[in-house]
């Protein structure tokens, strides 16, 4: 039993992060504190000053933990990371929280690759972005691929290395095949330098030279060649134009405002580059009606800029935000030069901020309208489903199950959940098959259903014993309907498992046609055809697609992990991180065997003792 009185007494007089948990051990809130002792104790003092949301949270706190940090800045960074990790119920959650994509050029390689990534790291490579418009970054990448035949493989290719056979991309003119030695490092880097200059927007000589080439081709009546050069010029100009929107310069500014209704809110950001609004983003934030605007915007800024690497010099907000000095310091460290958060009182900047707020209202209204429309469509589909199956009530919560394996290897089971016709990702579960050997879908399904309902009954008993509220996101909430991604056989397995546990839940299966498309439902040993294009068929298709996607994704992740399990696991001093670094650098076990001591030491994370261990292992 957690001793609140004792734990509150021994709280340190230092900065840090506190983590609130409920009776099932779930993290429900993460907060930072300048002084942990003062901040945490506030929650358990007179609740009259607390908002409804805070009072509800305090009721659910069964225990708390804390992490002491050296500074308030460290506490802020740790808080951001923990919120992203746990997505606690009572923290402000951005509906569209994400890391923005960058274009990465692996300049620490002899023959660099150019690709899109959402992971920014100070690793010596070149990054361009972040691109707040996800579509734009892929358009830019598409144009780069069209203009420059670069390699896309992950092979460790070094100049003068042993050549390998060129892949299909070489034969269709999409790659110059440095792996086969068909292009020198110097020639390849000419293309890379051009790309860097185009993305930087710093070199106009490329277009000038191309225009001269085009004019010369036209004079010599080589119109086809001239047309190709013209298309190349247009593509480069288009890339440069798109890049302007995402290049943060000294005088650039972001404008952030918030609009809330009686329950939820929308945060809107306008990006102003060279005095023009070049882009915008909006984020829906749920259940913030009781939260002060200054707190919401403060949390939003920490979360929003925590996911990007480039920050403007000035950010305009409607009022002074909570911990403004600390947030400015956090952003300044991230940017590398001073960042200001300002409140415009009048003039153009105030007018623009008003426009941001108006747009936030419009986006929130549209979001709510779409939600209502979607809710009606989903309800209609659930009514149709209940009617078709003859259920007494709407199947508000549907659980769907699938098994995935390739020739019996890495068998996995997955459970996806739909509530009120919408996917509820937080309740998804995945199971690695333990007791079944070989490709046996029926027995694999029996195992995962048994594990699911066994866990569920244990939780239900625990909740009843402690007189607790049912918690969301665990096994204790049972479905109104189970949907099997298979026919009569899988339905019967599910019914047998439920009978063993003494649970009554209706179970249906999906019947497919010759083209493996769902044509109907099997229920009570009868096949029921569903009209194609109906709301019910759309719902069933969404459920089926989602359970397939989730199963395949999990299966692929297990397969990839298994592939990485190699002979390297037997080498002393070589852990998972070092294995990955070795495979990324050398591409294969054979190349690692042939590597010199100097090449091994040049691998990230490989010290002298690890390199000696590798050499000794392969020479023995």
Curated annotation (Swiss-Prot):
Name listed for the protein in its UniProt record: UvrABC system protein C
Function: The UvrABC repair system catalyzes the recognition and processing of DNA lesions. UvrC both incises the 5' and 3' sides of the lesion. The N-terminal half is responsible for the 3' incision and the C-terminal half is responsible for the 5' incision.
Keyword DNA repair: yes
GO biological process, one term: nucleotide-excision repair
GO CC annotations, alphabetized: cytoplasm; excinuclease repair complex
Domain GIY-YIG: 13-92
Residues covered by the UVR domain: 204-239
InterPro entries, sorted: DisA/LigA_HHH, GIY-YIG_endonuc, GIY-YIG_endonuc_sf, GIY-YIG_UvrC_Cho, RuvA_2-like, UVR_dom, UVR_dom_sf, UvrABC_protein_C
PROSITE patterns in the record: GIY_YIG, UVR, UVRC
Complex formation: Interacts with UvrB in an incision complex.
Subcellular location: Cytoplasm
Listed Pfam families: GIY-YIG, HHH_2, UVR, UvrC_RNaseH, UvrC_RNaseH_dom
Family statement drawn from the similarity comment of this UniProt entry: Belongs to the UvrC family.
Gene field: uvrC
Keyword terms of this UniProt record: Cytoplasm, DNA damage, DNA excision, DNA repair, Excision nuclease, SOS response
One GO MF term: DNA binding
């Amino acid at each position: 039993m957690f001793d609140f009185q004792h734990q509150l007494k021994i709280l340190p007089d230092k900065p840090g992060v506190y983590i609130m948990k409920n009776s099932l051990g779930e993290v429900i809130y993460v907060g930072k504190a300048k002084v942990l002792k003062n901040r945490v104790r506030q929650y358990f003092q007179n609740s009259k000053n607390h908002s409804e949301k805070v009072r509800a949270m305090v009721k659910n706190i069964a225990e708390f933990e804390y992490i002491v940090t050296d500074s308030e800045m460290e506490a802020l960074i740790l808080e951001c990371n923990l919120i992203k990790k746990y997505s606690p119920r009572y923290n402000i959650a951005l509906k569209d929280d994400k890391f923005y994509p960058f274009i990465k050029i692996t300049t620490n390689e002899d023959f660099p690759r150019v690709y899109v990534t959402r992971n920014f790291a100070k690793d010596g490579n070149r990054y361009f972005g972040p691109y707040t418009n996800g579509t734009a970054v892929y358009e830019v990448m598409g144009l780069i691929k069209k203009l420059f035949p670069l390699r896309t493989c992950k092979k460790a290719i070094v100049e003068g290395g042993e050549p390998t056979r060129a892949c299909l991309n070489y034969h269709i003119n999409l790659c110059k095949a440095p792996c086969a030695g068909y292009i020198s490092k110097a020639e390849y880097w000419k293309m890379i330098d051009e790309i860097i200059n185009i993305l930087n927007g710093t070199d106009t000589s490329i277009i000038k030279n191309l225009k001269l080439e085009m004019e010369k081709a036209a004079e010599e009546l080589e119109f086809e060649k001239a047309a190709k050069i013209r298309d190349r010029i247009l593509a480069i100009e288009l890339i440069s134009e798109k890049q302007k929107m995402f290049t943060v310069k000294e005088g650039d500014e972001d404008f952030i405002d918030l609009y809330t209704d009686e329950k939820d809110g929308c945060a809107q950001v306008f990006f102003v580059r060279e005095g023009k609004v070049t882009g915008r983003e909006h984020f829906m934030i749920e259940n913030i009606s009781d939260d002060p605007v200054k707190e919401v915007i403060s949390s939003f800024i920490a979360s929003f800029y925590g996911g990007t690497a480039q920050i403007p010099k000035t950010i305009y907000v409607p009022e002074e935000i909570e911990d403004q000095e600390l947030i400015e310091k956090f952003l300044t460290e991230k940017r590398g030069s001073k960042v200001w958060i300002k409140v415009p009182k009048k003039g153009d900047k105030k007018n623009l901020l008003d426009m941001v707020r108006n747009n936030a209202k419009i986006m929130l209204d549209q979001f709510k309208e779409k939600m209502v429309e979607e809710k009606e469509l989903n309800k209609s589909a659930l009514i149709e489903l209940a009617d078709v199956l003859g259920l007494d009530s709407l199947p508000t919560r549907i659980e769907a199950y699938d098994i995935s394996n390739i020739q019996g290897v890495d068998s996995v089971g997955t459970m996806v959940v739909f509530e009120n016709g919408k996917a509820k990702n937080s309740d998804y579960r995945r199971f690695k098959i333990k007791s079944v050997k070989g490709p046996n879908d029926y027995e694999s399904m029996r195992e995962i259903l048994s594990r699911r309902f066994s866990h569920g009954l244990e939780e239900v008993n625990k909740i009843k014993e402690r007189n607790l509220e049912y918690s969301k996101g665990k096994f204790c909430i049972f479905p109104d309907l189970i949907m099997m991604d298979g026919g009569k056989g899988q339905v019967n397995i599910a019914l047998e498992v439920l009978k063993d546990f003494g649970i009554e839940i209706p179970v249906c299966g999906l019947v497919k046609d010759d083209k493996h498309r769902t044509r109907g439902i099997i229920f009570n040993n009868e096949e029921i055809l569903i009209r194609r294009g109906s709301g019910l068929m759309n719902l069933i298709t969404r459920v089926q697609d989602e359970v397939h996607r989730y199963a395949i994704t999990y299966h692929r992740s297990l397969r990839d992990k298994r592939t990485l399990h190699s002979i390297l696991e037997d080498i002393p001093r070589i852990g998972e991180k070092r294995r990955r670094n070795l495979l990324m650098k050398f591409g294969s076990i054979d190349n690692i065997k042939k590597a010199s001591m100097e090449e091994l030491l040049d691998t990230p994370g490989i010290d002298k003792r690890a390199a000696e261990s590798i050499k000794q292992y392969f020479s023995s």
